[in-house]
From Swiss-Prot:
The keyword Zinc-finger does not apply. This is Large ribosomal subunit protein uL14. GO terms for cellular component: cytosolic large ribosomal subunit. It comes from the Bacteria. SUPFAM superfamilies: Ribosomal protein L14. It comes from Chlamydia muridarum (strain MoPn / Nigg). The keyword Lyase does not apply. Binds to 23S rRNA. Forms part of two intersubunit bridges in the 70S ribosome. GO terms for biological process: translation. InterPro entries: Ribosomal_uL14, Ribosomal_uL14_bac-type, Ribosomal_uL14_CS, Ribosomal_uL14_sf.
Amino acid sequence: MIQQESQLKVADNTGAKKVKCFKVLGGSRRRYATVGDVIVCSVRDVEPDSSVKKGDVVKAVIVRTRNDIRRKDGSTLRFDTNSCVIIDDKGNPKGTRIFGPVAREIRDRGFIKISSLAPEVI
């Protein structure tokens, strides 16, 4: 579960390393976000010569969470990190590569491009 003030790692090659969530999109008083949800973030830590700068406000979709993801068949899935991928206003990823596995729920939510760029879909 990701909420306001949560810090996430960035799982793409935009140059951002860490972002801080300050809004969960999808409702006026929505508190928590999980895999496949879109959040608004501020970039906190960047690599040199990156396409995004520190302090930029970006949209991101969550691809991994440490909290359990429950599936319809009763199985659960948990990752080691809270990670996201920075997207543009149309929902396409800004980077050209995705690092690490992503959950299958990403494809179910309509982020086909992210799931196709990922090395592994769990």
